[in-house]
Amino acid sequence: MISVEHVSKRYLTRQGWRTVLHDISFKMEKGEKIGILGRNGAGKSTLIRLISGVEPPTTGEIKRTMSISWPLAFSGAFQGSLTGMDNLRFICRIYNVDIDYVKAFTEEFSELGQYLYEPVKRYSSGMKARLAFALSLAVEFDCYLIDEVIAVGDSRFADKCKYELFEKRKDRSIILVSHSHSAMKQYCDNAMVLEKGHMYQFEDMDKAYEYYNSLP
C-alpha cells in the first residue's frame, strides 16, 4: 500500500516560498493502477518524486508497504562520466540484486550493444532512456512510476516496453502520468487531476477527462 497523508511541498525561490503541492491525500492498494492528469506546472513530476522517495514532503507523510520504482526511463540519476555498465553495477549494489541477471537482461533488452561500455555522457537522450527503462524492469518492483507514456525511440522498442510492463507485470501497481486519454483508459483503473497543486479524485475516467479538459 501507498498512503499519501496531507502532503504539501514548497520550494524557496528568488521570489520567496512557492507551494507546489497543497495538502494532498490518497491511498493506493497493491495491484491498483492510477492515472494522474494535469497541465504543465501542476505538480505532477514533483508528486512522482515524493512518492518514489527522491524528495521528502515539506509537511505530511507518505507511508509505503510495497517497493516503488524510480520514474521509468528517468536517466537523471546516471553518473555521466561512468559507463552504462558501471551505472548498472552501482544500481545493483544499491538494490542488492544479482548483477549477472541484471547485466544479461539489460544487454538483451536495451539493445545498446557496445555502447553499454561507453560513458553515459556520450549517449543520446534515446539511448539513456533505453538504459533507464531496461534497468527499471531488471529490478523488480511492486509499483512502477511512469511519467508520461513510454517514448523511447522507435515504435517497435516502445511496444516491447509496453509488453514487459503492462502484460508481463500486469499484477503490479502503476502510477501513470499522461495527457493521453486512450492510455489512461487502457492502463488505469481510476484517475486523479492535479490543478495548481490541488488533487481531485475520480473513479470514472471520462469524468476525470471532462474536468481536465475544462481547465483553462
From Swiss-Prot:
- What enzyme class is recorded for this protein? translocase
Q: Does the keyword Metal-binding apply?
A: no
Q: What is its main location?
A: membrane
- Where would you find this protein in the cell? Cell inner membrane
Gene3D superfamilies for this protein: P-loop containing nucleotide triphosphate hydrolases
Q: Which reaction does it catalyse?
A: ATP + H2O + capsular polysaccharide-[capsular polysaccharide-binding protein]Side 1 = ADP + phosphate + capsular polysaccharideSide 2 + [capsular polysaccharide-binding protein]Side 1
Cellular compartments per GO CC: plasma membrane
- Pfam families for the chain: ABC_tran
Q: What InterPro entries does its record include?
A: AAA+_ATPase, ABC_transporter-like_ATP-bd, ABC_transporter-like_CS, ABC_transpr_TagH-like, Bact_Polysacc_Export_ATP-bd, P-loop_NTPase
Q: Which UniProt keywords apply?
A: ATP-binding, Capsule biogenesis/degradation, Cell inner membrane, Cell membrane, Membrane, Nucleotide-binding, Polysaccharide transport, Sugar transport, Translocase, Transport
Chain ranges of the ABC transporter domain: 2-215
Positions that bind ATP: 38-45
**PANTHER family associated with the record:** TEICHOIC ACIDS EXPORT ATP-BINDING PROTEIN TAGH
**Function in brief:** Putative ATP-binding protein, and an energy-coupling component of capsule polysaccharide export apparatus.
* Similarity section: Belongs to the ABC transporter superfamily.
Return the protein name. Capsule polysaccharide export ATP-binding protein CtrD
Gene that produces this protein: ctrD
